[in-house]
C-alpha cells in the first residue's frame, strides 16, 4: 500500500529586512515621527495629552472625509453616480470612526476639563478650517466663518474657494435636473456661497424618487446621502453631550455660547428634503 504524499513542511519565516540606509520605508511613507511629535501640551495635567491627541485625530478624519466628498462631488459633475456612491459609502465608515473619537472625551467632568482648559486660551473647535470645509461641502455656508483665518493666507484661500464652489448637495441637485427631475431654476442658479435653504419642489422630487424602485441608482444615491446626514447629526449631538458634561452652560473657549450654540447646530438637518420627503411616501 502506497503512502499518501505528505505536504511539505512549512518553511521557517524569513527574517524581515531590518537594515536600511536611511529611515525605514514605513517612516518615509507614514511620517510617524512627525505625527507623534506634534503634541506640545501647555499644562502639567495628564488629561491634556488625551484631549490634544483626540482633537488631532479628529482633524485627520476631517481631512479624509473632505477628500471623499470632493471625490463624490467631482463624480456627480461627470454623471458618474457609482463612483460618487462608493466615495459616500467610504465616508460613512470614516464618519463612524470620527464619531468614535469622542469616546475618550465623552465622560470628562468639569473638574477634569478645568485642569487644562486654560491651556486652550481662546481656541475652539469652530475655528477648525478642515471642519469648516466639511460644513461647506454639506451646504452649510457662511462667509463670516472665513474671518478667523485671515492671518493664514493658504488656509483662507482654500476656504474662500470652497465657499464659492457648489456644495456636494448642489451637485446632487444638478444631477437630478440633468436626469429630467423637477429642480427649480431658483435652486439651480442660487448663490452657492450662501447656506442652502430647503425647497418644496426639491422635496417633491425626492418624494417621487422614493416612491419608485428602491434599487434605482438615484434612490441608492439618496440613501447614501441620508447615511452621511445621519452620522453628521450624530457627530453634532455627541459634541453637544460631551460639552454639556464637561462644562455645563458656561461660555465656550472661543467666545461662543457653548452648549446653547451647539444645541442650535444639532437641530439642523443636513440634506433637509431627504428627511422631509419621507413623510409623503
Predicted segments with their positions:
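Surface-exposed peri-terminal alpha-helical interaction modules
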Residues: 2-281
Amino acid at each position: 500500500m502506497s503512502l499518501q504524499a505528505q505536504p511539505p513542511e512549512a518553511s521557517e519565516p524569513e527574517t524581515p529586512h531590518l537594515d536600511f540606509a536611511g529611515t525605514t520605508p514605513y517612516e518615509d511613507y507614514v511620517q510617524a515621527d512627525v505625527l507623534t511629535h506634534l503634541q506640545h501640551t501647555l499644562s502639567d495635567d495628564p488629561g491634556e495629552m488625551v484631549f490634544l491627541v483626540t482633537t488631532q485625530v479628529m482633524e485627520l478624519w476631517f481631512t479624509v472625509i473632505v477628500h471623499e466628498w470632493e471625490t463624490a462631488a467631482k463624480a456627480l459633475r461627470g454623471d458618474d453616480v457609482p463612483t460618487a456612491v462608493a466615495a459616500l459609502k467610504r465616508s460613512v465608515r470614516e464618519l463612524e470612526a470620527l464619531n468614535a473619537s469622542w469616546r475618550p472625551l465623552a465622560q470628562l467632568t468639569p473638574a477634569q476639563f478645568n485642569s487644562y482648559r486654560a491651556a486652550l486660551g481662546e481656541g475652539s473647535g469652530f475655528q477648525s478650517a478642515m471642519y469648516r470645509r466639511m460644513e461647506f461641502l454639506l451646504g452649510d455656508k457662511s462667509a463670516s466663518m472665513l474671518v478667523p483665518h485671515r492671518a493664514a493666507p493658504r488656509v483662507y484661500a482654500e476656504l474662500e474657494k470652497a465657499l464659492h464652489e457648489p456644495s456636494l448637495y448642489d451637485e446632487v441637485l444638478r444631477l437630478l435636473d440633468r436626469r429630467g427631475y423637477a429642480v427649480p431654476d431658483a435652486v439651480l442658479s442660487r448663490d452657492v456661497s450662501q447656506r442652502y435653504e430647503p425647497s418644496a419642489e426639491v422635496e417633491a422630487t425626492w418624494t417621487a424618487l422614493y416612491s419608485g424602485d428602491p434599487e434605482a441608482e438615484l434612490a441608492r444615491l439618496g440613501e447614501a446621502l441620508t447615511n452621511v446626514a445621519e452620522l453628521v447629526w450624530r457627530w453634532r449631538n455627541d459634541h453637544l453631550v460631551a460639552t454639556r458634561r464637561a462644562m455645563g452652560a458656561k461660555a465656550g473657549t472661543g467666545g461662543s455660547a457653548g452648549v446653547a450654540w451647539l444645541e442650535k447646530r444639532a437641530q439642523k438637518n443636513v440634506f433637509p428634503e431627504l428627511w422631509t420627503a419621507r413623510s409623503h411616501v
